[in-house]
Amino acid sequence: MQVSAHTNDVLGELDAVSIGRGISAGDFTAQEAVSAAIARLQSVDPVLHGMVCERFELALAEAAGLPASGSGAPFAGVPSLIKDNTDVAGLPTRQGSAGTSPEPMAEDGDFTRTFRATGLIPIGKSSLPEFGLTATTEPLSRPATRNPWNPAYSTGGSSGGSAALVAAGVVPIAHANDGGGSIRIPAACCGLVGLKPSRGRLPTMAVADKMPINILAEGVVTRSVADTAAFYAAAERHHAPASLMPVGSVTSPGEQRLRIGLCVGHPLAGACDPEVVAQVEQVARQCEALGHGVQPIALPVDRQMADDFFLYWARLAAAMNYLGKMAFGRDFDRRQLEPLTTHLSKHYLWRCWRSPMAIRRLRQFAVNYQALFTELDLVLTPVLATPPVELGYLDPALDFATALERLIRYAAFTPPQNVAGTPAISLPLGRSSDGLPIGVQFAAGMVQERR
């Protein structure tokens, strides 16, 4: 049974661009838009568990403070959410963990400031698995976040709370970030648009910029390509790195004939689910019908690349575990960490001597991956090897070896773009026989989001 608030009121089915225009035109006020979103949240979140803390009164006050025709920002007064691994003044940043402090943050983080500059008003913070370390949103410290298409299924992760509440019609757009697929995977599971932008496109956490390879990208999940494009156009008015070609305003399809590489197999995923393969191949045929060239390719990935990436991923868990007091303050309690985090930490400690060579190989992989785009414009793949999985399949309390193998197979197609720093988007272009969304991924070369 689907869980939806889309038809609770006249605003529930509108996208963010339409709500922003309605506020600007005086059709309704920002306060009415925010109040309606809060009511929609309260109607579905007892089932979905997508929000971890609220700021309803502050959001309503911010909306009331806007001029009747908005502030001039494209999303002025549009209600939204910030993922709970990003600082928002007055709210704690728990990172999906019982080990972090419940004390509120003194100020907004860098990304939050850019997010707010577009006019979006956060009504609260959305759920994630502990430290965003897995592809489902089932933290042990609170109820699992459920998929609005079928609450017995996973939303994906790690931006599962944002995806669930956008898909359910609570808000039209919400913050997400991606260190191995965490924008694209929830978008695929919940039938949304999820773009992981090029490295550096938006401000990330300070710790990410200090990593040997910055695999993290900030972004949003939305219900329309138009909203995603409008968000990046608005955000780069406030954060436009000189080293990156601007995305600019994208309001219509391009006219260029594109060279598309098609890959529906993966050495780590094994044989993908037939429904996933059929959907990706159907999209390839549609691209050919539009005049684009499609050719089969093999991705430059192997088990060594996966082992190197997951060692790097485990390094992040070890940093959270053993350096948590430095990162999160003296109230951090590592005794409260979940089994997946502690096992990943041990995985890294037992193999940390391999880390320098793993990083070197990952950097070479990034070069090899980017080289694909000397002959291609886009690469078309599944987002996930199967349709969304049931809750429990990736439970963080599972035996570690089982959890790791399941995760590697399920999410094999998304880490390459994090290592390479290149953009990739999940598009909701199909459904399984069970009625669950199937996401299709288009990946491009560095700074080629417009394609």
Give the ranges of each region predicted by the language model.
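A short helix-breaking turn/cap at a secondary-structure junction
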Residues: 196-283, 301
